[in-house]
From Swiss-Prot:
Region forming the signal peptide: none
CDD domains attached to this UniProt entry: IGPS (cd00331), PRAI (cd00405)
Annotated GO MF terms: indole-3-glycerol-phosphate synthase activity; phosphoribosylanthranilate isomerase activity
Pathway: Amino-acid biosynthesis; L-tryptophan biosynthesis; L-tryptophan from chorismate: step 3/5; Amino-acid biosynthesis; L-tryptophan biosynthesis; L-tryptophan from chorismate: step 4/5
Reaction catalysed by this enzyme: N-(5-phospho-beta-D-ribosyl)anthranilate = 1-(2-carboxyphenylamino)-1-deoxy-D-ribulose 5-phosphate; 1-(2-carboxyphenylamino)-1-deoxy-D-ribulose 5-phosphate + H(+) = (1S,2R)-1-C-(indol-3-yl)glycerol 3-phosphate + CO2 + H2O
Keywords of this entry: Amino-acid biosynthesis, Aromatic amino acid biosynthesis, Decarboxylase, Isomerase, Lyase, Multifunctional enzyme, Tryptophan biosynthesis
Enzyme Commission identifier(s): 4.1.1.48, 5.3.1.24
A UniProt-annotated Pfam family: PRAI
Family to which the UniProt record says this protein belongs: In the N-terminal section; belongs to the TrpC family.
Quaternary state and interactors: Monomer.
Region N-(5'-phosphoribosyl)anthranilate isomerase: start-end pairs: 263-474
Record's protein name: Tryptophan biosynthesis protein TrpCF
GO biological process, one term: L-tryptophan biosynthetic process
């Protein structure tokens, strides 16, 4: 393909990479290519062969053309250890000038993770395929906006020598047709316009209609949160996500929230329950401070829980209307006002303002709203801008009952967690309401007949509900 057909940004990157080819040849000149071992980790298989379920290729990168430097202290091995908990494959940028990549990063990740590793590069020459495999790649990226059919076929044949899978990137209908003719099995649809770096999230939907049913469709670029994943999940098998993860200080938290959403497991009473909640996929852990509640925790238990599982964001839940400062210890991320609804919207706003003044700017303030109350929807809409999150619950909370989800105002959904009787049996229906996440409590506890375990968090139920959450799409 002539350079006149290449997008300006892409053309400059590819030409720069072409200038690196001699350096790459010198770097692996000592390598007997014919003796390179074949890959034993299949990206295609790890992505479930396109048979359903949201899968992720999480990317290690320190910079990008659209954002510049995104992670100054870049440790791909540490990032890969995190990704290994959540992803089905790991992509590693190897282009140095615009992405800060290097083959050393590829080798580090390949040696760190059990997952198949994708060499993310602008591959135009067989020596790059050889280098990818030598440094541990199990798959390579080939871009049809860069390669003509003859070039692609030659590089694909070279990849086949080492059992490397190919992520074939396409950006329009013509490239999809070419990819099908060339035998592609993994289609990467890039939402980014390579001319101006803009994003079109509808591109994967349009092109999905043309991609064979037995292929894997990977949506690339612009996948920034779990809501986007759920919007695209009806036609995409997998998602390649990089900048949204490596730009965050806490990569583990960012990956967990991307895969599962901002969900909370409330009523934690033991360190082991907190550890299971986090391992299952929860972002938030609720600690209840009410002596009348069977899930009440003492300050001593609170400290043990936080020490045992520091990777949850803990929310102190209470029915009080004052004294929230007394609940603040190291590790408390938010306070949740679970007091009964006040007599008016003005009184609600005053209560929230008083609590916010009490706890200070470093602690979030959440408000639980009884949606069973005739005023619930009105109050939720009125105070949405005053709080960091709303908890939409039945009655005064803790009842294990479900309210009428149709009463949730559309305007508050993005800032709300849906609560009240949510269990593995109705989690999918709860997610379909479209709130930011779920607040899970009694629906994942052992029943009354479980002996001494009755009322404790059921680890199996937690795993089951988060499995449903991770595969849900609209």
């Amino acid at each position: 393909m002539t350079s006149n057909n290449l997008p300006t940004v892409l053309e400059s990157i590819v030409e720069g990479r072409r200038g690196h080819l001699e350096e790459i040849r010198a770097r692996i000149a000592h390598v007997d290519v014919d003796a390179l071992p074949k890959s034993t980790r299949s990206l295609f298989d790890s992505l479930n062969q396109g048979r359903g379920g949201a899968r992720f290729i999480m990317e290690c990168k320190s910079a990008s053309p659209s954002l510049g430097m995104i992670r100054e202290h870049y440790q791909p091995g540490e990032i890969a250890r995190v990704y290994s908990r959540y992803a089905s494959g790991i992509s590693v940028l190897c282009e140095p000038d615009r992405f800060g990549g290097d083959y050393d990063h590829l080798a580090t990740v390949a040696a760190t993770s059990h997952l198949p590793v994708l060499c993310k590069d602008f591959i135009i020459d067989p020596v790059q395929v050889h280098a990818a495999r030598y440094f541990g790649a199990d798959a390579i990226l080939l871009m049809l906006s860069v390669l003509d059919d003859e070039e692609y076929a030659a590089l694909a044949a070279e990849a086949a020598r080492f059992d490397l899978d190919i992520l074939t990137e396409v950006i329009d209908e013509e490239e999809v047709a070419r990819a099908i003719k060339l035998g592609a099995k993994i289609f990467g649809v890039n939402h980014r316009n390579l001319h101006d770096l803009s994003i079109d999230l509808d591109r994967s939907r349009r092109l999905s209609k043309l991609i064979p049913a037995d292929a894997v469709l990977v949506s690339e670029s612009g996948v920034r949160d779990t809501e986007t994943v759920r919007q695209l999940g009806g036609h995409s098998n997998a998602f390649l996500v990089g900048s949204q993860l490596t730009s965050q200080e806490n990569v583990d938290l960012a990956a967990r929230e991307l895969v599962y959403g901002p969900n909370k497991v409330c009523g934690l009473t033991s360190p082991s329950a907190a550890q299971t909640a986090r391992a299952a996929g929860a972002v938030y852990g609720g600690l209840i401070f009410e002596e009348a509640s069977p899930r009440n925790v003492s300050r001593e238990t609170l400290q043990k829980i936080i020490a045992a599982e520091p990777n949850l964001r803990y929310v102190a839940v209470s029915r009080r209307t004052s004294g929230y400062k007394d609940l603040l210890v190291d590790g408390i991320f938010a306070v949740q006002i679970h007091a009964p609804l006040q007599d008016s919207v003005e009184a609600e706003k005053a209560l929230i303002a008083a609590v916010r003044e009490e706890v200070g700017p470093q602690v979030q303030v959440w408000r639980a709203i009884s949606m069973s109350s005739p005023l619930g929807a009105e109050v939720a809409a009125a105070v949405e801008g005053d709080v960091d999150k709303l908890i939409l619950d039945a009655h005064e909370g803790g009842s294990g009952e479900v309210f009428d989800w149709a009463t949730v105002p559309a305007a508050v959904k993005a800032k709300s967690l849906l609560a009240g009787g949510i269990s593995p049996d109705n989690a999918a229906q709860a997610l379909a309401v479209g709130c930011a996440g779920l607040d899970i409590n009694s629906g994942v506890e052992y029943p009354a007949g479980a002996g001494t375990w009755a009322g404790a968090k059921d680890a199996g139920a937690l795993l089951k509900i988060f499995a449903t959450i991770s595969t849900f799409h609209y």
